[in-house]
Structure formats: structure tokens, C-alpha cells
A protein has these predicted regions:
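TPR/TPR-like alpha-solenoid repeats
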Residues: 47, 62, 85, 100, ...
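N-terminal leader/linker segments that initiate helical-solenoid repeat arrays
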Residues: 17-50, 54-61
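Hydrophobic face of amphipathic alpha-helices that form TPR/SEL1-like repeat modules
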Residues: 27, 43, 58-67, 96-103, ...
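Bacterial N-terminal signal peptides
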Residues: 5-15
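Short helix-capping/linker turns of helical repeat alpha-solenoids
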Residues: 24, 36, 49-52, 66-69, ...
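Terminal, low-structured helical/coil segments at or just beyond the last alpha-helical repeat
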Residues: 207-208, 214-278
Length: 278
């Protein structure tokens, strides 16, 4: 459980790497995917020093995200390079800065500063930024607790297909946080998130990752995981949604569940939601 909590935190910070790798043949990102961590540091630094915000973000993530071997993390430099990218308006770096402030690992925790950077990312339609604001208002971290605002942010991102926000929206309906309690809508939104990966596929992926962790060569620097943290976050969120469904089934009638399933189908059709491609 602790491992997956760490991965969820890292995935929010490093989520740009996988999507960027899909957009470009950048040697920097290719080296990360191939686990050539020290070479990646060299190549990413060259591009970062030339002002490339994507390379700056990747370099910052490497400096705090490489594990094992004799590599020593450099949190100060990690924050420096990511902030360089964020100050250029690169939304994924803005999100990374927000998460750094929220989690207090790379830099001291400062939820109020995190909110500023979440807002910058959200203003550029970064759904993780929108979700970050939802979480702050839901739990009163750095802001006065406001369930209605949290609900609005969850709904905004959920309607665009953001899985964590779909779960957050469902829980808001379940717990009557910012909206009138509605178990049918709660089940529908949790179901939408839960069905993005089927149970057998989820189990197979989790087993594969478990085997990789158990057979990891800890004498060598490791960074390949940074290229797929977004995928791992999606897996964890989907698994969490599936567990919530089991609880909801114990609290709802067959009639309510069938109504919720119908609603979920209508929402998916209207919003053109699709299953995750892993």
C-alpha cells in the first residue's frame, strides 16, 4: 500500500514524461524509457540549458526521481529546473511545482503556493491541475474547506474523462459533499472509472509490476519507471474505483444499481468516454 501511495504522488509530478514521449522522438525521453539514467541526465541537461521547457522538466524529474545504484538525489536542482520550465508557462511543469509544494518531499510543504500553481495549470486546461484544486477544497488543504467548489472542480475534470476526478465526483455524491446525496449518480461515476480497465487485465498488470520490483537490480540507477507513472496512476485509480463499487453494491438495491448502470452508459455515450489503452 505504501508503495502505491508513493507511485501516486510521483505520477502526478512526472505525468508529463509519458505523454511527451508519445509526442516526440527526443533522445532525452528515449533514454529514460530505456533506463539509461545517467546518459539521460547528460542529454536532458544539454536541451534544458538551451531553454527547452520539456527537457528542463524531464531533467528536474530525473534529479529527484532516479532510484537505486549510487545515485544521489539533488532536490534543490530538481526544483530549480522544473521551476524554470513552469515560469515559461509549461503547464505540466506548473503542475509538478504544485505537487512538490503539496507533498513536501522535494521542497518544504506550502499548500498555499501549491494552489497558485494548480490554478496556473488549470487555466491551461490541465485536468490534473483542476483535480488538484478539487482536492484542496475537498480536504481544506491550503484553503478554507469548500465542498461546493470541490464538487465543481471534480465535475469539470470528470466530464472531460479525468479518471481521478470521476472517482472524486462519485464520492462527492456518495458522501453528500457539495451536492445532494445521490447513490445512483455516485455508482454511475465510480463505475465509469472502474470500467476503464477490466479486472483480469488489472490483475495481470499488477502482477507484472510486482515481478519487476522483486527482480529489480538495485545496484544500478533506475529511471524507467518515470516513463510509465501516468499509466500506473491510472491503474491504481481504476483498482480503487473497483473496490468502492463492491462497497456500494452492499448499500444499494438491485433497482438502484441497474438505474446507475444505465446512467453510466448514457454519460459515456454522451461524453464519448473510452477504455484506457495500456
Amino acid at each position: 500500500m505504501v508503495y502505491f501511495k508513493v507511485i501516486l504522488f510521483l505520477s502526478l509530478i512526472f505525468s508529463h514524461i509519458q505523454s511527451y514521449a508519445n509526442e516526440t522522438d527526443s533522445a532525452c525521453l528515449t533514454l529514460i524509457s530505456n533506463n539509461q539514467c545517467l546518459k539521460a541526465l547528460e542529454v536532458c541537461r544539454v536541451d534544458a540549458e538551451q531553454g527547452d521547457p520539456k527537457a528542463q522538466t524531464a531533467l528536474g524529474m530525473l534529479l529527484s526521481g532516479i532510484t537505486h545504484g549510487d545515485f544521489r538525489k539533488n532536490y534543490k536542482q530538481s526544483f530549480y529546473w522544473v521551476k524554470q520550465a513552469a515560469e515559461q508557462g509549461y503547464s505540466k511543469a506548473e503542475l509538478a511545482i504544485a505537487e512538490m509544494y503539496m507533498n513536501g518531499v522535494v521542497i518544504p510543504m506550502n499548500a498555499k503556493k501549491a494552489k497558485v500553481w494548480y490554478e496556473k495549470a488549470a487555466a491551461q486546461e490541465n485536468l490534473n491541475g483542476v483535480n488538484g484544486l478539487a482536492r484542496q477544497y475537498r480536504y481544506g488543504t491550503g484553503v478554507r474547506k469548500d465542498y461546493e467548489k470541490a464538487f465543481q472542480y471534480y465535475q469539470q475534470a470528470a466530464l472531460e474523462g479525468h479518471t481521478r476526478s470521476q472517482v472524486g465526483l462519485g464520492l462527492s455524491y456518495r458522501d453528500a459533499k457539495g451536492v445532494k446525496k445521490n447513490m445512483v449518480k455516485a455508482y454511475a461515476w465510480i463505475l465509469i472509472a472502474a470500467e476503464k480497465i477490466d479486472k483480469q487485465q488489472l490483475q495481470a498488470i499488477e502482477e507484472r509490476y510486482k515481478d519487476e520490483r522483486e527482480n529489480l537490480d538495485q545496484t544500478m540507477p533506475q529511471c524507467k519507471h518515470l516513463s510509465r507513472l501516468e499509466q500506473m496512476s491510472e491503474i491504481m485509480t481504476t483498482g480503487y474505483a473497483q473496490r468502492i463499487l463492491l462497497d456500494l453494491k452492499q448499500r444499494m438495491s438491485i433497482k438502484q444499481i441497474n438505474k446507475a448502470k444505465k446512467l453510466a452508459l448514457e454519460i459515456k455515450k454522451e461524453r464519448a468516454f473510452t477504455r484506457s489503452v495500456l
